[in-house]
Amino acid sequence: MGNCHTVGPNEALVVSGGCCGSDYKQYVFGGWAWAWWCISDTQRISLEIMTLQPRCEDVETAEGVALTVTGVAQVKIMTEKELLAVACEQFLGKNVQDIKNVVLQTLEGHLRSILGTLTVEQIYQDRDQFAKLVREVAAPDVGRMGIEILSFTIKDVYDKVDYLSSLGKTQTAVVQRDADIGVAEAERDAGIREAECKKEMLDVKFMADTKIADSKRAFELQKSAFSEEVNIKTAEAQLAYELQGAREQQKIRQEEIEIEVVQRKKQIAVEAQEILRTDKELIATVRRPAEAEAHRIQQIAEGEKVKQVLLAQAEAEKIRKIGEAEAAVIEAMGKAEAERMKLKAEAYQKYGDAAKMALVLEALPQIAAKISAPLTKVDEIVVLSGDNSKVTSEVNRLLAELPASVHALTGVDLSKIPLIKNATGAQV
C-alpha cells in the first residue's frame, strides 16, 4: 500500500526507491505521484524565485580605485529533468536560505573578479554592459548547480575617495558648457524656427479662415436655399393639409347638418304628436272642465243678475215709496209752516210794533246766549271800580250798543221800535 502525493507548480516532488529498484528517482512538479509505504522516500524542493543582493566593498578596479558595488539578482532552480536532478543532488534537504547563500557567494566572487578587469568609467558609465558581463561569466557556474539567473542588475556604484564625484564634476562642467552652447544655439534656431512657424501658421490660418469663410458662405447660401425649399414644401403641405382638413370639416358639417335636419324633422314630428297629445289632454283636463265651470258660473251669474235686478227694483220701489211719503210729509209740514207763517204775518201786521217787540224779545235770549258763550268758561267776573257812577255808566254804554249789535246779527233795527227807542233814549 502507499499514498498519492500532489504538488503545486511552485514545488518539485522527488520520489526515490520503490518496487522498481533502489536507484529509481521520479521528479514531479505541478502534478501527483504514487509512493509506497516503507520502501519509497518523498522530498520537496522549492521552485520559487529567490532574490539575492550581492555586495562587493572596496574592490580595486583595473586602475586601482577602490569601489563598492551592489546589485540585485533573481535566480531559481531550473525545471529541466537533468538540471533539476543536479539541483536536487546538491540542495535537496536544504532550506531556501542555504541555497541563497551558496548562489550569493558565487555571484559575489564573479563580481569581484570582473571589477578587477574594468576601469571606473567602464563600470560607472556602462552598467548594463557590466551587469551583462557578470551574468555571462557567472551563469555557467551556477548552471552546473541547476540554478538559472533570471536577471542581474547593478544597483549602486560608489567610492570613499570622491573619485566618482570628481569625475562627475569635470564631466558636469563639460556637459554644462556644451549644454549652454546647445541651449543658445537651440534658442537661436528655435527663435528662427518659431518665427518661420508663426509665419507659416498665420499663412495657414489666413488661408484656413478664407476657406472657412467661403465654406460658411456657401453653407449659408445652401442652407438658405434648402430652408426656402423646405419652407415652400412645408407651406404647400400645410396648405394642402388645411384644404383637406377644410374639405373634411365641410363633409363632416354637411353630415352633421343632414343629421340635424333628420333629428329636427323627427323632433318636429314628435313635437307635433306631443302638441296633439297635449291639446287632447288640455281639452280633456282643462277645456271641458273650464267650459263646464264657465257654463255653471254663467248660470250662477245670470241667476245672481236676475236676483240683483229684482233686489234693485225692489229697493228702488222702496226708496221711491219712502221718498213719496217723505215728500208728502215735507209738503204737509211746509204747508203747515207756511200757514203758520201766514198767520204770524197776519198777526204781526195786525198787532204792529207789539208783535215785533215780542219777536225781538223772543230772539234776545238766543242772542245773549251766543254773545255770552265765551263767558261760560269764566268762573268769576270782578269789576274793579271805586265809584258807583262808573259802573252805571258802563251798563248804560252796553245797552246803548245793543241795538247796533242786534241789527248787525239779525238785520232788525231796534232803534225803529218805539219801546226800545224810548228805553235807550232815556238811558242816554
Curated annotation (Swiss-Prot):
Tissue expression profile of the protein: Expressed in many tissues, including suprabasal epidermis, hair follicles, heart, lung, thymus, spleen, liver, kidney and brain. Not expressed in skeletal muscle.
Subcellular location: Cell membrane; Membrane, Caveola; Endosome; Membrane
Lipidation (N-myristoyl glycine): G2
Lipid linkage positions (S-palmitoyl cysteine): C4, C19, C20
One Pfam family cited in the UniProt record for this chain: Flot
Biological processes, Gene Ontology terms: anterograde dendritic transport; cell adhesion; negative regulation of amyloid precursor protein catabolic process; negative regulation of gene expression; positive regulation of canonical NF-kappaB signal transduction; positive regulation of establishment of T cell polarity; protein localization to plasma membrane; protein localization to plasma membrane raft
CDD domains linked: SPFH_flotillin
Membrane topology: Peripheral membrane protein; Lipid-anchor
Cross-referenced Gene3D superfamilies: Band 7 domain (3.30.479.30)
PANTHER family, A to Z: FLOTILLIN-1-RELATED, FLOTILLIN-RELATED
Protein's job: May act as a scaffolding protein within caveolar membranes, functionally participating in formation of caveolae or caveolae-like vesicles. May be involved in epidermal cell adhesion and epidermal structure and function.
Name this protein carries in UniProt: Flotillin-2
Species name: Mus musculus (Mouse)
